[in-house]
Curated annotation (Swiss-Prot):
Protein name according to UniProt: ATP synthase epsilon chain 1
Native species: Methylococcus capsulatus (strain ATCC 33009 / NCIMB 11132 / Bath)
Pfam families: ATP-synt_DE, ATP-synt_DE_N
InterPro entries assigned to the protein according to its UniProt record, in alphabetical order: ATP_F1_dsu/esu_C_sf, ATP_synth_F1_dsu/esu, ATP_synth_F1_dsu/esu_N, ATP_synth_F1_esu_C, ATPsynth_dsu/esu_N
Membrane topology according to the record: Peripheral membrane protein
Keyword Lipid metabolism in record: no
The protein's assembly and partners: F-type ATPases have 2 components, CF(1) - the catalytic core - and CF(0) - the membrane proton channel. CF(1) has five subunits: alpha(3), beta(3), gamma(1), delta(1), epsilon(1). CF(0) has three main subunits: a, b and c.
Similarity-based family: Belongs to the ATPase epsilon chain family.
Length: 140
């Protein structure tokens, strides 16, 4: 039996996932971070992307997070994000529309703040679509 840790994924709306896992992979600012039980404690900001949770004997679970914070303790992983959604619940049409709107705003280039906001919105939309694509491929 593999060692496990407790994982909590929490959004502004409430708890999205709480359970035991062998491995968590999250989108850290410097790249993907893989966490197993007894990992050294640390805090890391997250960028928009896919969080994968692998539990023994179960299919991996996939979630989209809009960024946030990752806290790691030896037997506890907590992910706090403004938005967290199970991959299977992502609204593909809404994500495609958000991507299109962000691309239009980037093409406009009317102001620095609007450009930065459009870049962030585009990154979130692309991350949602990539999470959904990975889920559908069974990569979760």
């Amino acid at each position: 039996m593999a060692m496990t840790m407790h994982v909590d994924i929490v959004s502004a709306e409430g708890e999205i996932f709480s359970g035991q896992a062998e491995l968590v992979v999250a989108p850290g600012q410097e790249g993907e971070v893989g966490i197993a039980a007894r990992h050294a404690p640390f805090l890391s900001p997250l960028k928009p992307g896919e969080v994968r949770v692998k539990s023994e004997g179960q299919e991996p679970l996939s979630f989209y997070v809009s960024g946030g914070m990752l806290e790691v303790q030896p037997y506890l992983v907590t992910i706090l994000s403004e938005t967290a959604v199970r991959a299977k619940d992502i609204d593909e049409a809404a994500a495609q529309e958000a991507k299109r709107a962000a691309e239009e705003a980037l093409a406009d280039r009317s102001g620095r703040m609007e450009y930065a906001k459009a870049q962030a919105q585009l990154a979130e939309a692309v991350a949602q679509l990539r999470t959904l694509e990975n889920y559908r491929k069974g990569r979760a």
